[in-house]
A protein has these predicted regions:
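Extracytosolic and intramembrane catalytic regions of membrane-associated proteins
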Residues: 312-462
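Central hydrophobic cores of alpha-helical transmembrane segments
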Residues: 61-64, 105-109, 277-286
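Alpha-helical transmembrane signal-anchor/signal-peptide segments
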Residues: 295-314, 424
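Glycine- and aromatic-enriched alpha-helical transmembrane segments of multi-pass membrane proteins
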Residues: 153, 241-302
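Hydrophobic, aromatic-rich transmembrane alpha-helices
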Residues: 38-46, 207, 260-268
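Aromatic-rich juxtamembrane segments at the membrane interface
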Residues: 1-85, 91, 168
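Internal transmembrane alpha-helical bundles of multi-pass membrane proteins
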Residues: 75-259
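Membrane-helix interface "capping/anchor" motifs
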Residues: 48-53, 92-104, 202, 268-276
Length: 462
């Protein structure tokens, strides 16, 4: 959690944080950089109060430390955004009368995209900037609703308004990418943000105890207990009724229309007039109309699909009654990875959870034998090993699609005596060299081919 390393997190823990709405604390973001910035500020502020001329130098030292931390943690987009924002905040301390606004956020985005334009399509980049923009715009308005004199209640109200604003800004993107909305996010953030601050500061103190191994070992038990308590409460929130709404979806145009509605609603909220309310209602009508149209156009239809999910070569055979089958080229497919990647797509098509087919199988309308799938009059050969190499036939078998994935080590020409191929589909698990080699063979033999690594997915309606 301190450095954003999620390699050793179990699937149960990741799911608990996802359902409860606390996933943002697992990934390094503005929350973590903010804690680090506050700690450094606490250490350095007494020095520049005593020697004012050192303030610019100490602020520069603070910024260099933040930049070093960003390099240490891998320069993820959310960390880079946070480091730039807090660096600007630090230098703004030299002129306190100039607050940070949306202009600062826009300047940060411009600098990041200038260095790496592809960040625009990064999920972390989009979520990070949408959350901060919503906090800057919406949180002060929400906070002004209730004037609280009690210091503790004022802190809780501030925490709640920040959570509501961030959730408002990121909800459309979260639904688009993850098909999930956590309903208990307020309760989660009221618990997890104070606990994360305790855990992070305790972890920093634990590192400082390195010269004292015995004391460090004892204090490690304290940190472990804090993490355990944090996780147990999140598990309790996960088990609450209606903790998350799953299987919901938006397409890209739906996301843009929802943001248009939120923008119009905010515009009307600033000054309530009939005209502004009408604009917001029209935007809401556009959202509902588009989503209804999408549901009708994405109704379950019979077809075959190939997906670009590295390490999971499958053929998805879909019926028009919401049932479907995943014919796997690998005997041990990574189903959790496949489901995480494709659940939003399946939800949008309103499909039930597909049935896994990993060996010889026969049912009404579909059969699979020797890695050859027959479905709805189409025949697909899954080529993931060398079983068909160095073999020939006087009567080549007609296959509509030859699906080549990692494991096959031969060429295409040697298979022409076995199969009459309509199209060759190259899985993303193949190396770039091998994809180019087979693609060149297909061009030479006049066989159409498809690169899933470039296409992303390929769906055939039957």
């Amino acid at each position: 959690m301190t450095v954003g390393d999620k390699e050793e997190l179990s699937d149960d823990i990741v799911e608990t944080y996802s359902v409860s709405g606390a996933s943002h604390v697992l990934a390094l973001s503005g929350l973590h950089i903010g804690f680090l910035y506050a700690l450094l500020l606490f250490v350095l502020r007494p020095l520049w109060r005593r020697w004012r001329r050192l303030k610019p130098l100490l602020l520069l030292l603070l910024v260099l430390f933040l930049v070093s931390f960003a390099f240490f943690t891998g320069l993820s987009s959310s960390v880079v955004r946070s480091v730039i924002m807090f660096s600007l905040l630090a230098f703004a301390g030299l002129q306190p009368e100039k607050p940070l606004t949306l202009n600062t956020l826009a300047a940060t985005a411009f600098l990041m995209l200038l260095c790496k334009p592809v960040w625009l399509f990064d999920v972390g980049f989009q979520l990070s900037f949408s959350a901060v923009a919503a906090i800057v715009l919406v949180q002060p308005k929400l906070y002004a609703f209730w004037k609280v004199d009690n210091r503790f209640l004022r802190y809780l109200w501030g925490l709640m308004t920040v959570s509501m604003a961030a959730q408002l800004g990121t909800a459309p993107l979260v639904i688009f990418y993850f098909s999930r909305f956590s309903t208990h996010f307020l309760l989660t953030n009221l618990w997890v943000i104070p606990m994360v601050s305790l855990v992070l500061y305790s972890a920093v103190f634990l590192l400082m105890l390195t010269p004292l191994p015995f004391v460090q070992h004892l204090f490690a038990r304290v940190v472990e207990a804090l993490v355990h308590v944090q996780n147990e409460v999140l598990r309790w929130i996960e088990r609450l009724p209606g903790a998350a709404v799953d299987d919901i979806w938006l397409d890209i145009w739906g996301v843009l229309l929802v943001y248009l509605f939120l923008g119009m609603a905010y515009y009307g909220f600033l000054r309530l007039t009939v005209r502004r309310v009408c604009f917001a209602l029209l935007a809401l009508l556009a959202v509902v109309s588009w989503h209804s149209l999408s549901i009708m156009s994405n109704a379950s239809r019979q077809g075959i699909a190939f997906y670009s999910v590295r390490g999971c070569p499958v053929v998805h055979c879909m019926a028009d009654n919401r049932h479907s089958w995943l014919a796997c080229a690998d005997s041990l497919p990574d189903m959790p990875c496949l489901c995480r990647a494709l659940s939003p797509h399946w939800n949008r098509l309103r499909l039930e959870t597909p049935r896994l087919v990993a060996g010889d199988y026969t049912t009404s309308g579909l059969s699979m034998r020797n890695q050859i799938v027959s479905y709805a009059g189409k025949r697909i050969c899954l080529l993931s090993d060398n079983r068909w190499r160095n073999k020939s036939s006087s009567h080549p078998l007609s296959v509509d699609y030859l699906y080549v994935s990692k494991g096959y080590q031969g060429g295409i020409e040697e298979l022409t005596s076995l199969f009459s191929m309509g199209m060759v589909v190259l899985d993303a698990s193949l190396s770039d060299y091998y994809q180019n080699k087979i693609a060149n063979d297909c061009v030479r033999l006049g066989i159409p081919y498809l690169l899933l690594s470039q296409k992303g997915s390929y769906r055939i309606l039957l």
